[in-house]
Amino acid sequence: MILPITIYSDEVLRRKAKPLKGIDTSHEELIGNMIESMRNASGIGLAAPQIGLSMRLLIVDLSPVQGYENAEPMVVINPHILAVKGYNAMEEGCLSIPDIHADVVRPSSIQLKYRNEHFEERVDEFSALMARVLQHEIDHLDGTLFVDKLQRRDRRKVQKSLEDIAAGKVHTTYPVAEINQGAKAS
């Protein structure tokens, strides 16, 4: 089932999401719906707050990106970045902030502790695009959006567009949730 994407200015995007204590069939169904919704919106990452749920769950699927065509969707639960290395700037966008793209400086490599779709604990290292997308989605779990990381002059450039989105002037090819709907029960 395709779920509507929560848009900029909705309060759930500004909250620190709650950890999951386990996973059951309802979470498995949710994960499938998140993957379907992300693909429908032509995204490569989606965090639970982006569908109105305050839970520490995210999905990454780089397969639409050239060079990553064989990538499988990755489920990340309760992530915690243990270490970072190097920094670089790269253009980012976000399904919750349609039509805005800007360069964001982030660590180029991370060591991540998380639980997978079977709720098994893992510690892995990620670099390049995967590290960037994971950090972007983890930020969603912490109530941070990529526009919060922009330098002042870049933020000024997109401010009017952000105000338009907050006012509901949004045009997307995917369904969006009503703004300020609040978090749904997890």
Swiss-Prot record:
Keywords: Hydrolase, Iron, Metal-binding, Protein biosynthesis. GO terms for molecular function: metal ion binding; peptide deformylase activity. Gene3D superfamilies: Peptide deformylase. Fe cation binds at C94, H136, H140. The active site is at E137. Disulfide bonds: none annotated. The keyword Protein biosynthesis applies. It is an enzyme of class 3 (hydrolase). This is Peptide deformylase. Binds 1 Fe(2+) ion. Belongs to the polypeptide deformylase family. Its EC number is 3.5.1.88. Signal peptide: none annotated. It catalyses: N-terminal N-formyl-L-methionyl-[peptide] + H2O = N-terminal L-methionyl-[peptide] + formate. The keyword Calcium does not apply. Its cofactor is Fe(2+). Removes the formyl group from the N-terminal Met of newly synthesized proteins. Requires at least a dipeptide for an efficient rate of reaction. N-terminal L-methionine is a prerequisite for activity but the enzyme has broad specificity at other positions. One of its GO terms (biological process) is translation. The gene is def.
